[in-house]
């Protein structure tokens, strides 16, 4: 399983997603791509004395962040280099099997519908 993770989404980002992803990669051997501000992700590693990412992990740089106050309908147009939009585009392009974000739910559903698209025969996006 190849997971693309929005490292900048959520209240405790990027620390919580980055540390959680590292633990998952170590425990389960999951391939994970952290998407976000590369320097901030590296700062989390330095702060916790982590010299190298586990095997199968990589960082994909995205300079912008979707804020909880951003208009979900406009995020796709206005923040094309956000961690959420870049991650969804990676998923749509086949770079991963799943995309995870603790960021704006509205922006995630809108982005998933517009970028990744729905499965044929499915009319509404699902959350789980």
Give names to the regions the model predicted.
Residues 1-114:
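Contiguous, glycine/small-aliphatic-enriched amphipathic segments in soluble metabolic enzymes
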Residues 110-128:
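Short, acidic/small-residue loops that bind anionic groups at enzyme active sites
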């Amino acid at each position: 399983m190849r997971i693309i993770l929005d490292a900048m989404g959520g209240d405790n980002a990027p620390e919580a997603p980055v540390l959680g992803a590292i633990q998952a990669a170590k425990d389960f051997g999951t391939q994970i791509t952290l998407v976000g501000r590369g320097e901030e992700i590296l700062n989390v590693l330095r702060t916790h004395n982590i010299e190298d990412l586990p095997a199968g992990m990589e960082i994909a740089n995205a300079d912008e962040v979707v804020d909880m106050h951003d208009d979900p309908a406009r995020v796709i147009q206005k923040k094309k280099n956000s961690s959420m939009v870049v991650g969804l585009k990676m998923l749509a392009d086949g770079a991963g099997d799943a995309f995870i974000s603790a960021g704006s739910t509205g922006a995630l559903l809108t982005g998933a519908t517009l970028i990744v698209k729905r499965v044929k025969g499915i009319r509404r996006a699902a959350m789980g």
